[in-house]
Amino acid sequence: AGAYTLFGKAIPPHHLAIATIGTVVALVAPKPWSPKVKLEPKIDASSPEEEKFIKEYLEKHL
């Protein structure tokens, strides 16, 4: 079976496949040590009362 030559060394195709899959998984997998991003939209209220009302409404209905 043929091997690829990289940097003057013969690399078997299955090693390249394993390296490719490992790289893709490492880049795509979620990182448990990364800081958690809170998925909450910014409340742009015109007054503190309105902001309080919006927060209470969201807590009640979501």
Swiss-Prot record:
InterPro entries: ATP19
Species of origin: Pichia angusta
Subunit text: F-type ATP synthases have 2 components, the catalytic core F(1) and the membrane-embedded component F(0), linked together by a central stalk and a peripheral stalk. The central stalk, also called rotor shaft, is often seen as part of F(1). The peripheral stalk is seen as part of F(0). F(0) contains the membrane channel next to the rotor. F-type ATP synthases form dimers but each monomer functions independently in ATP generation.
Keywords tagged on the record: ATP synthesis, CF(0), Hydrogen ion transport, Ion transport, Membrane, Mitochondrion, Mitochondrion inner membrane, Transmembrane, Transmembrane helix, Transport
Location(s), subcellular: Mitochondrion inner membrane
Record-level GO BP terms: proton motive force-driven ATP synthesis; proton transmembrane transport
Keyword Electron transport: no
PANTHER family in alphabetical order: ATP SYNTHASE SUBUNIT K, MITOCHONDRIAL
Keyword Transport recorded: yes
Cellular component, GO annotation: mitochondrial inner membrane; proton-transporting ATP synthase complex
Entry membrane topology: Single-pass membrane protein
Main location: mitochondrion
Pfam families: ATP19 (PF11022)
Transmembrane segments: 14-30
Biological function: Mitochondrial membrane ATP synthase (F(1)F(0) ATP synthase or Complex V) produces ATP from ADP in the presence of a proton gradient across the membrane which is generated by electron transport complexes of the respiratory chain. F-type ATP synthases consist of two structural domains, F(1) - containing the extramembraneous catalytic core, and F(0) - containing the membrane proton channel, linked together by a central stalk and a peripheral stalk.
Protein name: ATP synthase subunit K, mitochondrial
Sequence similarity: Belongs to the ATP19 family.
